[in-house]
């Protein structure tokens, strides 16, 4: 899976980038055939914003987290993305369990 980093007016520590890429790859395994991922870091005054985008086989999931530091913002974005993946998984299970009408 290709991961692209984008930083808008932000200096991001290497450790945060590494944590973000590992987490996105881990969550990408739960999505059917992940194609690419984008991690955006943004800094505006005291607020930090992290946006995660995961693209895979007809689905595009986007999650955003904000906080005073990049660590908590990343954790919030990962929680949002994980919730979206749970919802997508439930949708796939519901579709698979449809009874066949004769």
What is each stretch, according to the model?
Residues 1-102:
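N-terminal, polar/charged subdomain of small-to-medium soluble alpha/beta proteins
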């Amino acid at each position: 899976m290709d991961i692209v980093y984008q930083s808008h007016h932000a200096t991001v520590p290497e450790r945060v980038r590494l944590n973000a890429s590992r987490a996105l790859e881990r969550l990408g395994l739960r999505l059917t055939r992940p194609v690419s991922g984008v991690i955006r870091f943004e800094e505006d005054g005291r607020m930090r914003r992290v946006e995660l985008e995961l693209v895979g086989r007809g689905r595009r999931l986007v999650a955003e987290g904000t906080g005073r530091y990049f660590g908590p913002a990343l954790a919030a974005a990962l929680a949002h993305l994980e919730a979206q993946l749970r919802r997508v998984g439930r949708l796939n299970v519901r579709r698979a369990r449809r009874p066949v009408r004769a």
